[in-house]
């Protein structure tokens, strides 16, 4: 996946930061692993709340990891481009965070990469797996109306549409 504007993408992802961190008070982990950490904003937030926890970020984008490295300066965070390296750490009490990555895998990956993603997720190393709940409202019981979609396409910021596919 190529992101045209990292700043716009990361700014939009940060808007839901508190939702993504909601689970923190419900798990007792020594380590938090953000799979698809982007610019590291969630890891930075966790570090501010729990400075003694071990934090690990993973992203397949070298550009994102460079931004995360700058954003996380002074935080005790390890960043990885290859998730197999994270798995090899053999962490006993770790929470794997999947806050904004599942839709990316399905949107941009093929069947093989989707299967590989789930193989990595369900590795025995993780005590908890935190998935941000993005269930639709109960009132949604139909396909999107083409007029609604057209209205969104007409009124939306073109940069946002480029970053978040309709």
Cite the ranges covered by each PLM segment.
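A short, conserved alpha-helix within the catalytic core of class I
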Residues: 105-121
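Conserved beta-strand/loop positions that form the S-adenosyl-L-methionine
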Residues: 35
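Class I SAM-dependent methyltransferase SAM/SAH-binding core
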Residues: 41-76, 81-85
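Conserved glycine-rich SAM-binding loop
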Residues: 38
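A conserved beta-strand element that flanks and buttresses the S-adenosyl-L-methionine
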Residues: 97-98
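Conserved alpha-helix/loop element of class I SAM-dependent methyltransferases that forms part
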Residues: 10-29
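Conserved class I S-adenosyl-L-methionine
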Residues: 128-165
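Short conserved loop adjoining the S-adenosyl-L-methionine
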Residues: 86-91
